[in-house]
């Protein structure tokens, strides 16, 4: 396949450090921007809404998300000492953290999210140092269970947004559902009935159609965009930083799990684009870089990042691994991050449009978890690990007040996010349940 693709593009595109023509770098880089842009800004909008941030602060949070994603990508491409993977990846704000971010943000606010993120980033850095030793705790059955639970926990968020967003005066109206379902329909059509650019940009195109429809129905206000500046530097500690032990525990658990999960994304990149497994040095450097970025970005309001699987998929298909292509994509995101007017326009997207577009993303997260789970035989032991972890994780958090007799911090850590309970139960059961001879 590589030879066929190379016949249409210069050979330099398939070498990491080569210098292909600018005319080839730009369209391939923009392809990665299109694939990543929705994932970069949507978590920031979700967090801004749950934290009840004003229009100006919401714009800043989106700005920072763009800048952090760009800088995190550049650090992976151009490593500093042992920090960075030197692999062709795009890094962006991660949906995997969203359930925990919404839980912490709804209870404590944005400053506590950022404080917990600092400790989580430190934990991820430590995981990077000892990645070989810690991998044994996270086989596919455990990691798959965690990802599956993340997807499940995000469905209520998507449905609330499809209905118009909690607290909205028009919550549940037919107008919200009409826009949401049309957005959803366009995403599905583009993803499964088209090829090339429209398939790649299915979520973006769905949001564009939904946005235009919402605009025609008078559901969009440009007040925040009208007042936004054309250029603005990002100032540190704008949102402040607070430390809350229960939030820290939840975030550290999520950072450790996602640090180990990053191994899969790095492996997919090297296998799909370079026909090899990643080295231990690449894995360690990549995870440590993610940890450092999370710590530093927290001081500016940036949210946790991860490797984008959709961009890994592009690498697997076209096998273009030249870092200048990815650096160009990062620079586009970086420039966009310093233009508040652009970020402000993104914040005007109605919640029903976001819900209609993201429910398919959350479904894909869930199915990724199922694929990981089924990559190992579904023995009675493995089904017990998955079933019991999901049952306790989803069950406890679905019953309000189920931990009401415990100290407040217990309810905050274990009663607000199904992912935390599912993660701990899956790890514990995987360690203590006996294996038969075929599983040993």
Regions found by a protein language model. Give the residues of each.
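Membrane-embedded alpha-helical modules
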Residues: 104-223, 330, 335-440
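Juxtamembrane interface elements at the cytosolic ends of transmembrane helices
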Residues: 2-10, 40-44, 48, 183-193, ...
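Hydrophobic, membrane-embedded alpha-helices of multi-pass small-molecule transporters
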Residues: 23-36, 172-184, 202, 217, ...
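Generic transmembrane alpha-helix signature in multi-pass membrane proteins
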Residues: 44-48, 98-106, 132, 156-163, ...
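Short, non-helical or kinked segments that cap or interrupt transmembrane helices
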Residues: 60-61, 82-95, 136-145, 199-205, ...
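N-terminal signal-anchor module of multipass membrane proteins
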Residues: 1-89, 96-104
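Intrinsically disordered, low-complexity non-transmembrane regions of multi-pass membrane transporters
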Residues: 1-28, 222-235, 271-278, 286, ...
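Membrane-embedded helical hairpins/re-entrant loop segments and their flanking transmembrane helices
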Residues: 22, 48-84, 252-323
């Amino acid at each position: 396949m590589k030879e066929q693709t190379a016949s249409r593009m210069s050979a330099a595109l398939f070498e990491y450090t080569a210098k292909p023509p600018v005319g080839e770098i730009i369209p391939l880089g923009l392809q990665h921007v299109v694939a990543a842009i929705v994932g970069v800004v949507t978590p920031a909008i979700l967090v801004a809404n749950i934290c009840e941030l004003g229009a100006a602060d919401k714009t800043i949070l989106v700005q920072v998300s763009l800048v952090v994603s760009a800088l995190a990508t550049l650090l992976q491409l151009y490593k500093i000492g042992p920090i960075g993977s030197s692999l062709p990846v795009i890094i962006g704000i991660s949906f995997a953290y969203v359930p925990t971010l919404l839980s912490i943000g709804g209870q404590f606010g944005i400053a506590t999210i950022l404080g917990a993120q600092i400790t989580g980033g430190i934990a991820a850095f430590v995981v990077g140092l000892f990645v070989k030793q810690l991998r044994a705790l996270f086989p596919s059955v455990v990691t798959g269970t965690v990802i599956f639970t993340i997807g499940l926990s995000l469905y209520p968020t998507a449905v609330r947004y499809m209905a118009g967003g909690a607290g909205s005066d028009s919550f549940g109206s037919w107008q919200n559902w009409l826009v949401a379902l049309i957005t959803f329909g366009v995403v599905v059509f583009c993803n499964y009935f088209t090829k090339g650019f429209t398939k790649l940009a299915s979520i973006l195109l769905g949001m564009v159609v939904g946005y235009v429809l919402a605009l025609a129905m008078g559901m969009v206000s440009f007040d925040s965009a009208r007042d936004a500046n054309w250029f603005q530097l990002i100032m540190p500690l704008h949102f402040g930083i607070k430390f809350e032990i229960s939030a820290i525990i939840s975030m550290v658990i999520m950072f450790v799990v996602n640090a180990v999960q990053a191994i899969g994304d790095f492996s997919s990149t090297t296998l799909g684009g370079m026909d090899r497994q990643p080295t231990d040095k690449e894995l360690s450097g990549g995870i440590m870089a993610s940890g450092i970025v999370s710590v530093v970005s927290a001081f500016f309001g940036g949210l946790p990042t991860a490797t984008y699987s959709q961009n890994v998929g592009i690498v697997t298909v076209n096998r273009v691994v030249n870092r200048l292509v990815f650096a160009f994509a990062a620079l586009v995101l970086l420039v966009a991050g310093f233009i508040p007017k652009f970020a402000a326009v993104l914040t005007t997207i109605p919640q029903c449009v976001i819900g209609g577009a993201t429910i398919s993303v959350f479904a894909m997260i869930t199915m990724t978890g199922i694929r990981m789970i089924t990559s190992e035989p579904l023995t009675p032991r493995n089904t017990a690990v998955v079933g019991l972890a999901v049952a306790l994780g989803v069950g406890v958090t679905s019953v309000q007040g189920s931990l009401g007799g415990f100290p407040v911090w217990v309810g905050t850590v274990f009663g607000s996010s199904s992912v935390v309970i599912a993660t701990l139960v899956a790890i514990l059961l995987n360690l203590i349940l006996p294996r038969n001879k075929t599983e040993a």
